[in-house]
UniProtKB/Swiss-Prot annotation:
GO terms for molecular function: ATP binding; homoserine kinase activity. It is an enzyme of class 2 (transferase). Its EC number is 2.7.1.39. InterPro entries: Aminoglycoside_PTrfase, Homoserine_kinase_II, Kinase-like_dom_sf, Pseudomonas-type_ThrB. The keyword Amino-acid biosynthesis applies. This is Homoserine kinase. The keyword Kinase applies. Keywords: Amino-acid biosynthesis, ATP-binding, Kinase, Nucleotide-binding, Threonine biosynthesis, Transferase. Belongs to the pseudomonas-type ThrB family. Pathway: Amino-acid biosynthesis; L-threonine biosynthesis; L-threonine from L-aspartate: step 4/5.
Length: 319
């Protein structure tokens, strides 16, 4: 989450007149994340999250995202529920942007994920995959493999200023990853960005899965690969196979992986590392200096990619 667009008290008060959630008591910007402008909103009726959509989000995709969230919430998944205005709309204009209000979920995200977090995460992700099976609309993954070469091209040679030779290393890894990319694996709706700051815990149980604005219809095992990257590396970039094993066991207790999915884990993990390296690099270059936003170091994913390039099989991930 982040803040790019400022909202005045008067504009927000007028916006809330269209909703049955009471009057504004307080609101503040949330600096974490890099995508949309987000505010914590308290009204006389309770706590909510206000999101103004920015940057990579295509307005045409918003009904799909919010529809998926409503669908998953109806299946008892702990995800935000979009709040509809009096006229039934869940998207409305505010401060020159399209905006939505969603319910607030209690809990905190784990700053230092442990093995105890990884098992519940895997199980929750599998339940999410199964719960989305009967959500009929589909959405192509704009940041899937076909999107990585043009993203690298847009970064130009700027990667070499971050680390000498980075652009060439990433290009070589990308070419090899695309050549080995699996196509015929089970697919459905995935979160595609299930990082620790998008997962809330309360009393050692998952209380919230948030930020579905990269969700898409893609390989289930790719969603797992994203999480292996995000949850299973230590601060020194060593891979924690105990965390990985817990995550995979938690997932497979709900939805067992096929042999082909298991075999594909190394290349899927390489692809996930490349995806986040590239988007972080692009944001590193292009984030405005005055934006209330936390930029993330692209090299965090360079070192992850180095591990995946050396992985010989799924056994290196604890399978």
């Amino acid at each position: 989450m982040a803040v790019y667009t400022e909202v005045t008290d008067d504009a927000l008060a007028a916006f809330l007149e269209g909703y049955d959630i009471g009057r504004m008591v307080a609101f503040r910007g949330i600096a974490e994340g890099v995508e949309n402008s987000n505010y914590s909103l308290r009204t006389t009726e309770g706590d909510f999250i206000l999101t103004l959509y920015e940057r990579r989000v295509d307005p045409a995709d918003l009904p799909w995202f919010l529809g998926l969230m409503e669908h998953l919430a109806a299946k008892s998944l702990p995800c935000p529920l979009p709040v509809r205005a009096r006229d039934g709309a869940n998207l409305n204009p505010l401060a020159g942007r399209i905006a939505a209000i969603t319910t607030f979920l209690p809990g905190v995200w784990p700053r230092r994920p442990t093995v105890a977090h990884c098992g519940p995460l895997g199980a929750a992700m599998a339940r999410m995959h199964l719960a989305g099976e009967d959500y009929a609309p589909t959405r192509a993954n704009a940041l899937g493999p076909q999107g990585w070469p043009p993203l690298l091209a847009r970064c130009g040679d700027s990667g070499d200023a971050v680390r000498p030779g980075l652009t060439g290393e990433v290009r070589t890894a990308l070419d090899a990853t695309l050549a080995a990319w699996p196509g015929a694996l089970p697919r459905g709706h995935i979160h595609a960005d299930l990082f620790p700051d998008n997962v809330f815990f309360l009393d050692h149980a998952i209380s919230g899965l948030i930020d579905f604005y990269f969700a898409a219809t893609d390989l289930y095992a790719y969603d797992i690969a994203v999480c292996l990257n995000a949850w299973c590396f230590e601060p020194d970039f060593s891979f924690n196979i105990t965390k990985s094993r817990a995550l995979l066991r938690g997932y497979q207790a709900v939805r067992p992986l096929s042999a082909a999915e298991t075999e594909a884990l190394p290349v899927l993990c390489r692809g996930a590392a490349i995806r986040f390296l590239l988007t972080r690099l692009y944001d590193w270059i292009n984030t405005p200096d005055d934006a209330l936003v936390t930029r993330k170091d692209p090299l965090d994913y360079y070192w992850r990619l180095r591990f995946h390039l050396q992985a010989g099989s799924a056994a290196d991930y604890g399978v």
